[in-house]
Structure formats: structure tokens, C-alpha cells
């Protein structure tokens, strides 16, 4: 009678457990021990049968040297590592950590113990990070573990701009570098980043290392997709680079690329592989027609340097990023397509969002209760969007919870400006919190010249602008000031024509645009534009409807207006604030606002940012 799969598996596990527990018990009580493993000064009594059953390495040693099988001396391995390996063979238990995993991995490879090898591979894969990815990649290549090497390479490719800055990147061998930069999965927007990384690599190290790398440069260059480089960059940067000019072979390669830009492709002849002796004999018999059939025996291929396949990171598109407590959705106004970026519901309802010039997205706001902090348990959420994994990462929480504040960025720092305290007093704030993106720590920055909330904060050219809002007397302000982090000072600028709060604002075409909002007399539709160069405000085409909390977004040279609240009349004739989820676009030629969408899903309660995302990673909705 055939046993069911579950019953058969249960019986197998029972027998395995019985066998393993029995062997461990005999080891602990010194029964039937017939072998000693010596590592330095330490000895490990054990059973030859266990070692031979689990390791082809030990099995081969015992069979090759039967007379000395009672003692095994191991060199170039730590006693602690051997102790862990033997403990695993008898118990199936192993304690891995970042400090020991590489030594155990190497031991498992040397002693040919596939189970420990697989456990180490899984451990390293799960803990891949910027700090260890290059070391893990090299380890995978060294131990001939394709699974680990490919996982680490893919991790490196996905974060290439960051990894290429690491000093460990400069320590790669030519073959290791080629394995990375030849990948289609390289996450770079422009091939210029690959060229610059290769040049830094070739110029690093001592004189001997530089000479060796420069000899390998023609081979490495085959993996730089120079046809993707703009012609101007090719002529001004690549062709004139000292390392390129010093090698005629590299100059010939650059000329091939320039010819390709003009439509003249250089091809190489590559002999087709012969198929057995019959092909060879047939070729010999037809010696007289060799010249006429030469083309049949060869195939033409493009040199590697003429490869123009786009990298993975070159599929970035300009999108409007809508962030709400329901999730994050990216909208492509050019194609009228929506993409799901994240279904996470950890975004606080009342939040402020920011996109940096490096295209990093941050969210701050809401209330976070930290029960471990007895003195001041209340803080606010601070999250960063991970483009690669499409998820929100928890960052050090905002130490001072507040609402109606603004977010700005300059010089690797993020600024939380003004707002109102989330306390009974609801005091207006002039304080500015500063988050250092390099040290991942919060601190205090220079306070504002005045307390403000409901204002807008914009960033441009490493300066932080604060516009409008309401002061301590709850009156709307027309003030505008700018913070220069290099000088650690605030400076007041020309005031707006209309005092307002809760309005839309953005930097577009090198100028600051504001639209709609709340005034002391109610909602407004008025708009104005500020010339940064002239420090002057002028009127702009009014928005078609009076609104508060309108969002302005500058995307790919076009100015968009999204959402907000308007006062609408209900069927009963009552006027109530109503949230709108529409999209408008400003027509530069006709100087007017045009409706794009009457309503877009997922925009309710959202903040809007202009971002560049890789649509290959996103799911079309």
C-alpha cells in the first residue's frame, strides 16, 4: 500500500530526527568516537561516519588515507568555525551573524557541505546592503557561487550611482568591473555615469595598479555603451580625457563610435563554429571555392563599444506622484496613464511631502507615539520612498510634532519650517528643524524671522524660500524670505501682491508661481509670479476657480494645478467646502488654464510631487 506524501514525509523526518539525536547523544557521552579533528591547539572528537556522510571532502580523505583516518589536521581555518560546522552536522543548528558568515561560507565551500553553503548564501542575500554588496559580489565570484554573485551584482546594478562612489568600487578587478557595467540592468539615467565611474576606477590605486588598469582599459571600454553618449560629450569629455588620448587603441574605438553617430557602422568578422569533423572534411574537399564562400563561413558582429541597448535606468519618465493614506500612485499626464507605486497605508493623513533635486521622496507629519521615550513620547512620522522596492522606509522620527508646516531641502539637509504645535495651545512656530541626510540625525537650524503656519516652502539652487501663511495673530501674510545654509542667515524678499495662506506654489521655468489660497476675506483665485533674478512679483493668469490647498506642479516644462478645496452649493442650497480631485494645465501659447481631467482616482487627500520613476518597475493601473 502506497503511503500518502504527508505520512511519508512525517516518517522520514521522524527517522532523521531519531538518527541525528542518537548521534549527538553518542558524541556528548563519548561513545563510539573514532576520529579527532585537530585545528591548531584544539581537538574535536567525532565520528568518521558522520563526517564522511555529510562531506565529500572528508570522505575522500578517509578513503585516500585509511591508516591515518583516525586523525584529521585542518590548516587555514579557525577553530571556532570548525566547532560551528561540527555542531551543525550533529544538530542542524547554526548561529550566523555578519561577523562569522563569510568564514563559514568559505569553510562550507572548502569542505563541500552544501547545506551550510546554501544557508550562508540565503543569509548573505537577505542582508545585502550598500556597505557589503561589493564584498559579497567578490566572495560569490571567488567561491564560484553563481546564485550569490548574480544577486549581489543585481543589487549593485540597481544602486550603481551610489555604489560607484564607494572606495571599495575602486578596488574591483577589471573582470569584476566588466561583470557589473556590461549588465543591461544598470540603473543609470545616462551612460555618462558609467564612463565617469570607469575613469575614476582606472585612475585609482598606486602607480603599479594604475598601470595595470590602464592596460586593461581597452577591454573594459568594450562594456561602456559609448553610442549612448551624446556626440558633444564624446568629443569634449571622452576623446580629450588624458587616459583615452594616451592610448591609440582607445582613440580608434572612439572614432568607431563617432562614425556610428554618422551612420557608418564598423563590423567585425567572426568565424562561425565548425560542426564536427564532417564539416571540416567538406570544407577541405571544396578548397577551390574557399574564396567565394568566405562570407558564408563568417558572420559580422558589432564591437561591444557600439552596443546601443538602453540600460534599465534609462526608462525613467516624468510623472506626478500622488501620496495619500491609501497608497502612492504615479500619473503620466502625457499618456494619461496611472501606475501603482505603493499600496502602503502607513502614510499619515495630514502630511507634507518633498522631492529633492536627487529625486528622493520624503514625507513628514502625523503623530507617532514612542512608548520608550518617557519624557517626550510624541513625535511625527518621517518616511522616505524606496524607488527600487516600491515601499516606504521609516526614518528617524520628527522630534517635534507639528502641523501646517513646510518642507525644504538644500545642501544634503531637509528643513522642517514653522507650523503650529500639536498641543492645546496650538502656538505658531518660528523654529526650524534640520535633518542631515549624511548623518541621519535631526538638529535645530536658524529660526525664522517670524512665526508662521499655513505657508509654502520651496527649494531652488540650494536656497529655501518661505512664502505667505498666517502669523501669530492668525492674519494672512504677504511676506517672503529666503534661507541661505551657506551663510546661516534668513533674508526678507519682496512681499507678494496678495497676502494668502494654504495656496499652491512651485518653481517653474526659473520663477516662483503661486495660485489661489485663503485670504483674510475668503478664498481667492488670483495668481502671481516672482522673478528670482529681479526680486519682483507680477500678476499671472488667475485660476478658473477660488480654492484653498491647491497644488502646483512643474513637470517636463508644463505647469499643472491639482486638487484643493472649493466652496460649492449643495442640493439644499447650503455652501460647504468640497474637495476636488481634478487636474488643470497652463497653456503657455494661449495664456490660459485648461482642464485635463475632471476627476482622477487616488487623488483624495493626496499631496503631489513631480518625480522621475522607472515605469518598468511599476504596475500599470
Curated annotation (Swiss-Prot):
Name of the featured protein: Kelch-like protein 40
Organism, as annotated: Mus musculus
Quaternary structure and partners: Component of the BCR(KLHL40) E3 ubiquitin ligase complex, at least composed of CUL3, KLHL40 and RBX1. Interacts with LMOD3.
Function as written in the Swiss-Prot or TrEMBL entry: Substrate-specific adapter of a BCR (BTB-CUL3-RBX1) E3 ubiquitin ligase complex that acts as a key regulator of skeletal muscle development. The BCR(KLHL40) complex acts by mediating ubiquitination and degradation of TFDP1, thereby regulating the activity of the E2F:DP transcription factor complex. Promotes stabilization of LMOD3 by acting as a negative regulator of LMOD3 ubiquitination; the molecular process by which it negatively regulates ubiquitination of LMOD3 is however unclear.
Gene Ontology CC terms: A band; Cul3-RING ubiquitin ligase complex; cytoplasm; I band
Family classification: Belongs to the KLHL40 family.
Assigned keywords, A-Z: Cytoplasm, Developmental protein, Kelch repeat, Repeat, Ubl conjugation pathway
Domain of life: Eukaryota
Amino acid at each position: 500500500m502506497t503511503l500518502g506524501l504527508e505520512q511519508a514525509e512525517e516518517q522520514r523526518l521522524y527517522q532523521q530526527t531519531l538518527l541525528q539525536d542518537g548521534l549527538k547523544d553518542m558524541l556528548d557521552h563519548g561513545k563510539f568516537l573514532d576520529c579527532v579533528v585537530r585545528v591548531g591547539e584544539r581537538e574535536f572528537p567525532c565520528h568518521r561516519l558522520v563526517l564522511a556522510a555529510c562531506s565529500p571532502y572528508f570522505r575522500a580523505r578517509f578513503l585516500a588515507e585509511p591508516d591515518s583516518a583516525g586523525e584529521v589536521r585542518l590548516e587555514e581555518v579557525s577553530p571556532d568555525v570548525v566547532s560551528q560546522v561540527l555542531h551543525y552536522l550533529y544538530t542542524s543548528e547554526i548561529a550566523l551573524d555578519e561577523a562569522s558568515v563569510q568564514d563559514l561560507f568559505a569553510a562550507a565551500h572548502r569542505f563541500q557541505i552544501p547545506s551550510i553553503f546554501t544557508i550562508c548564501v540565503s543569509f548573505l542575500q537577505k542582508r545585502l546592503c550598500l556597505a557589503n554588496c561589493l564584498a559579497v559580489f567578490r566572495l560569490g565570484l571567488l567561491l564560484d557561487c553563481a546564485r550569490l554573485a548574480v544577486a549581489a551584482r543585481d543589487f549593485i546594478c540597481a544602486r550603481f550611482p551610489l555604489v560607484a562612489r564607494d572606495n571599495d568600487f575602486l578596488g574591483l578587478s577589471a573582470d569584476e568591473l566588466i561583470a557589473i557595467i556590461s549588465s543591461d540592468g544598470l540603473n543609470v539615467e545616462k551612460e555618462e555615469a558609467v564612463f565617469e565611474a570607469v575613469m575614476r576606477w582606472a585612475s585609482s590605486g598606486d602607480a603599479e595598479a594604475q598601470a595595470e588598469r590602464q592596460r586593461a582599459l581597452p577591454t573594459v571600454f568594450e562594456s561602456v555603451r559609448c553610442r549612448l553618449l551624446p556626440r558633444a560629450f564624446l568629443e569634449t569629455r571622452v576623446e580629450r580625457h588624458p587616459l583615452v588620448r594616451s592610448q591609440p587603441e582607445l582613440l580608434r574605438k572612439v572614432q568607431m563610435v563617432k562614425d556610428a553617430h554618422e551612420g557608418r557602422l564598423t563590423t567585425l568578422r567572426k568565424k562561425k563554429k565548425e560542426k564536427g569533423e564532417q564539416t571540416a572534411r567538406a570544407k577541405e574537399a571544396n578548397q577551390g571555392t574557399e574564396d567565394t564562400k568566405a562570407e558564408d563561413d563568417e558572420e559580422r558582429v558589432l564591437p561591444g563599444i557600439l552596443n546601443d541597448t538602453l540600460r534599465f535606468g534609462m526608462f525613467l519618465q516624468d510623472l506626478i506622484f500622488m501620496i495619500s493614506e491609501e497608497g502612492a500612485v504615479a500619473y503620466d499626464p502625457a499618456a494619461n496613464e496611472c501606475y501603482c507605486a505603493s499600496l502602503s497605508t502607513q502614510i499619515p493623513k495630514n502630511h507634507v511631502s518633498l522631492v529633492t533635486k536627487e529625486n528622493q521622496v520624503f514625507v513628514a507629519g502625523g503623530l507617532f507615539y514612542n512608548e520608550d521615550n518617557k519624557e517626550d513620547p510624541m513625535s511625527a512620522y518621517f518616511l522616505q520612498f524606496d524607488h527600487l522596492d516600491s515601499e516606504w522606509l521609516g526614518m528617524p522620527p520628527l522630534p517635534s510634532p507639528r502641523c501646517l508646516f513646510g518642507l525644504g531641502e538644500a545642501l544634503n539637509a531637509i528643513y522642517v519650517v514653522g507650523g503650529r504645535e500639536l498641543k492645546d495651545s496650538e502656538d505658531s512656530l518660528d523654529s526650524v528643524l534640520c535633518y542631515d541626510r549624511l548623518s541621519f540625525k535631526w538638529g535645530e537650524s536658524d529660526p525664522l524671522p517670524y512665526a508662521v503656519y499655513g505657508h509654502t516652502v520651496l527649494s531652488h539652487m540650494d536656497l529655501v524660500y518661505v512664502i505667505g501663511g498666517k502669523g501669530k495673530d492668525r492674519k494672512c501674510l504677504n511676506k517672503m524670505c529666503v534661507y541661505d545654509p551657506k551663510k546661516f542667515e534668513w533674508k526678507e524678499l519682496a512681499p507678494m501682491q496678495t497676502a494668502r495662506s494654504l495656496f499652491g506654489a512651485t518653481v517653474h521655468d526659473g520663477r516662483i508661481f503661486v495660485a489661489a489660497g485663503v485670504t483674510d476675506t475668503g478664498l481667492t483665485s488670483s495668481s502671481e509670479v516672482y522673478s528670482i533674478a529681479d526680486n519682483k512679483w507680477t500678476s499671472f493668469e488667475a485660476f478658473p476657480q477660488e480654492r484653498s490647498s491647491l497644488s502646483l506642479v512643474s513637470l517636463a516644462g508644463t505647469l499643472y494645478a491639482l486638487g484643493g478645496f472649493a466652496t460649492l452649493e449643495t442640493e439644499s442650497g447650503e455652501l460647504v467646502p468640497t474637495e476636488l480631485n481634478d487636474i488643470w494645465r497652463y497653456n503657455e501659447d494661449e495664456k490660459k488654464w485648461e482642464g485635463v481631467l475632471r476627476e482622477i482616482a487616488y487623488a483624495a487627500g493626496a499631496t503631489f510631487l513631480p518625480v522621475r520613476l522607472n515605469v518598468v518597475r511599476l504596475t500599470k493601473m
